[in-house]
Amino acid sequence: MKEIVLAGGCFWGVEAYMERIDGVVETKVGYANGHVENPSYEEVCSSQTGHAEVCYIKFDETKISLEILLNGFWKIIDPTVENRQGPDIGSQYRTGIYYGHEEDLDTIIKSKEMQQKKYDANIVTEIEPLKAFYDAEEYHQKYLKKNPGGYCHINLEI
């Protein structure tokens, strides 16, 4: 099994989209790469902790490659906008790809380079090692499953 952590604005929609992909075996939402230990949702929303809202993804490489998974990710974000996705504004809504294994970096960079060809503006999506991940509160986990009419800025069709 492999793991990747993706930031694509509000984490509810990113998780709902990713968990529908064949080969994804686990998802959970949380906060990554900030400077405060175990922050609360309210703290992250203050834009003072440095965290991004993220979706942790564990996937089976025999069913889906990191490259294909990233292709899905690029479809649901605007990678040229900084600190915003849809109507959600703030540094916690930035886009990012946070990896735990150095060998994934080449695939991630190649994926970004392929996507850049589709845009006139530069892609501003962060690509960084995962420094810290904290689970979000339970009420955020599988939020759109628990609240089918809940807010989501992305198209959940795969």
Curated annotation (Swiss-Prot):
InterPro entries associated with the record: Met_Sox_Rdtase_MsrA_dom, Met_Sox_Rdtase_MsrA_sf, MsrA_MetSO_reductase
Family note: Belongs to the MsrA Met sulfoxide reductase family.
Reactions mediated catalytically: L-methionyl-[protein] + [thioredoxin]-disulfide + H2O = L-methionyl-(S)-S-oxide-[protein] + [thioredoxin]-dithiol; [thioredoxin]-disulfide + L-methionine + H2O = L-methionine (S)-S-oxide + [thioredoxin]-dithiol
EC id: 1.8.4.11
PANTHER family (UniProt xref): MITOCHONDRIAL PEPTIDE METHIONINE SULFOXIDE REDUCTASE (PTHR42799:SF2)
Claim: Protein transport is one of the keywords in the record: no
Source organism, top-level taxon: Bacteria
Species the sequence originates in: Alkaliphilus metalliredigens (strain QYMF)
Pfam family, one: PMSR
GO CC, alphabetical: cytoplasm
GO biological process, one term: cellular response to oxidative stress
Active site: 10
NCBIfam families: msrA
The protein's name: Peptide methionine sulfoxide reductase MsrA
Keywords: Oxidoreductase
Function: Has an important function as a repair enzyme for proteins that have been inactivated by oxidation. Catalyzes the reversible oxidation-reduction of methionine sulfoxide in proteins to methionine.
GO molecular function per UniProt: L-methionine-(S)-S-oxide reductase activity; peptide-methionine (S)-S-oxide reductase activity
